[in-house]
Amino acid sequence: RITPMEMIPMHPACMALHYGQALFEGLKATIDTNGTPLLFRPDKNAERLNFSARRLGMPEFSETLFVDALKELVSLDQQWIPPQEGSALYLRPFMFADEAFIGMRAANSYKFIVMASPSKPIYTDRIRLYAETSFIRAAYCGTGEAKAAGNYAAAVLPTEIAKSKGFDQVLWLDAKEFKYIQEVGTMNIFFKINGQFITPSLDGSILAGITRMSVIDFLRHKDFEVVERLITIDEIIEASKNGQLEEAFGTGTAVGVAMIQEIGYKDTIIHVSDNSPVGQLVLDTINGVRIGKIADELNWMVKLES
């Protein structure tokens, strides 16, 4: 059923509040120049939601029903889709354990809900990252590759500390050595070093971003070399010193593509080039495809037929 936004009645013993069985997704609906609503790769969100559900011991949700629910909601609320390029109707599907029970086990009942809200670009300027060396986001074999609510709770304090130092987000390093780059607070990350694009490989502790996947496909479609591999913070420092760090940008549903100005690491500031021509091309292409201004060569968009 579709209802106006309302409060969710919740028992104090709701298991999600105590044991953290909660996950979410995020995607955007846009509208093309002909007034047709569009969704960006909703099938991939459906797949990832079920991946997260399996990791958290939650039941899977019908992927067909997931996409159909989004289509129905967007069809009803399409007047709320901002027409400006870069803006969208942000969709937040989420699922949580709603059984009233005190005890450590999988819940017997869950709620699946989708809410919608108009949104505009988060970052319009280049951003500054702080490479964290005291806290971790996730460890190998943990829940880092799931879009679990608890992953974000663990990031709140380090993010606030980074912001207090003048940075925008945390750049997470690996849990064992604080050496290998993983991801940014709400984004995956790409570096262009000596003509080659590098993004950390999915090692079981990094979220498989749908924008990340799309950017890799787009770059390869445009004949850029893209490598998914382990990359150390020391390698980035060295590339910056040698003038080989040509670009760096983050990718994610909420931000789209965010150009990185610099990275703070211990007492070092890693400067990135002031220009991001390929990053800007990626951002302009994603935004253009989302409103039908640029041809959808990679079949990202799902049209909502009237």
Regions found by a protein language model. Name each.
Residues 1-64, 68-69, 73, 94, ...:
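Helix-start/capping segments and mature chain N-termini
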